[in-house]
Amino acid sequence: MMKFILDIVSTPAILVALIAILGLVLQKKKLPDIIKGGIKTFVGFLVVSGGAGIVQNSLNPFGTMFEHAFHLSGVVPNNEAIVAVALTTYGSATAMIMFAGMVFNILIARFTRFKYIFLTGHHTLYMACMIAVILSVAGFTSLPLILLGGLALGIIMSISPAFVQKYMVQLTGNDKVALGHFSSLGYWLSGFTGSLIGDKSKSTEDIKFPKSLAFLRDSTVSITLSMAVIYIIVAIFAGSEYIEKEISSGTSGLVYALQLAGQFAAGVFVILAGVRLILCEIVPAFKGISERLVPNSKPALDCPIVYTYAPNAVLIGFISSFIGGLVSMAIMIASGTVVILPGVVPHFFCGATAGVIGNASGGVRGATIGAFLQGILISFLPVFLMPVLGGLGFQGSTFSDADFGLSGIILGMLNQFGSQAGIVIGLVLILAVMFGVSFIKKPSAKEE
């Protein structure tokens, strides 16, 4: 039974489809409308997941070629890798904390101004796993582990979307949907940077192309060509012989590079199609939940939901974030610290999202500089998170996104300086502050 529940809540397509169905039922929609809304939401999320898989499958070989081409070694942050190891020991605790965290998230949304229902199931699973490991080693077991872990997760699920909601309103033009992706600290940094030094009237989507290059306005074309240049350069440095022998199963290195570039663009195209399908269904369906269960609540959805608003910023953000990762790596090598290699997957998904958010608040400069700083942030946070995880027996692996780093460091410090009491007091104080600010007159999302 527990495995069945874990499978449901960790499968975003099923989880969000059930949420959509619940919303439509609460609105007393007719059965055909409920079935249609649930299925289209389910299929939309599968389309997005499929597109993300295509992108990830095109980026993994790039990372291998990049490391070989430039003779690099170090730690590549990867959520999936560390979670796969941790679940073998902490699987049951993770499942219970995940379920408890979702309940606390709904309760916090119901009784505070943090009206965000976090619906990104795989990120919820990863965060629950990290919390389970840290609290277990701190000495918590059974019910205290589940309740405190669930409370910590519920708090993070509620606060994370709030970090960036101001910029989501600027991006979407309304306050109906939130961003549910545990790298919101980086997105906030990008949006804040854009608002300080950027000019949002000069959008990445208004970049002027000469008439002879007008075809580059098509995002699929521009992404394919840009990525082809990047892939071919790395393939040349890696060497065709190495690629044919180790990666491409005999396909010529340059041909393989072109294939990966096209695969990357295809993945982005599929993601954008899925996002459009989801947003057409989940936002109206969520109205029922907002009206009946959690007044004024907002669905917090995975990061690809923002890509349709600024496709050019997606590519600009990815490249800028990756450059930030390269600069950070050079600093680490020079300073003699542990070296964090720029993981292409987190730099794409987090960098692209930071680019879109930065563009909303500061145009081209916001997208470029904001995503660059976000790339530096997700490079250095793992350096400080690794001692926390290293002491738990996970040397050589770490989480990739900003909120994992921030949350893990805070929980680790509370445990280090106050042991179990420190963690309990810290979580209670954070929850008290959340309730406290909820009694203050609430500003609009644009003012927050």
PLM features per residue range, with description:
Residues 1-51, 92, 96, 100, ...:
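Signature of multi-pass transmembrane helix bundles
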Residues 1-3, 56-61, 76-88, 103-115, ...:
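Short juxtamembrane and helix-loop transition motifs at transmembrane-helix boundaries
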Residues 44-95:
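Membrane helical hairpin/interfacial module
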Residues 51, 55-56, 63, 336-340, ...:
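Membrane-proximal extracellular juxtamembrane segment immediately upstream
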Residues 52, 68-70, 92-96, 183-188, ...:
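Short, charged low-complexity intrinsically disordered segments located at boundaries
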Residues 55, 72-73, 88-92, 184-188, ...:
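Hydrophobic transmembrane alpha-helix bundles
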Residues 70-76, 96-102, 122-129, 150-154, ...:
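Mid-membrane cores of alpha-helical transmembrane segments in multi-pass membrane proteins
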Residues 110-114, 303-383, 387:
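Hydrophobic alpha-helical bundle architecture
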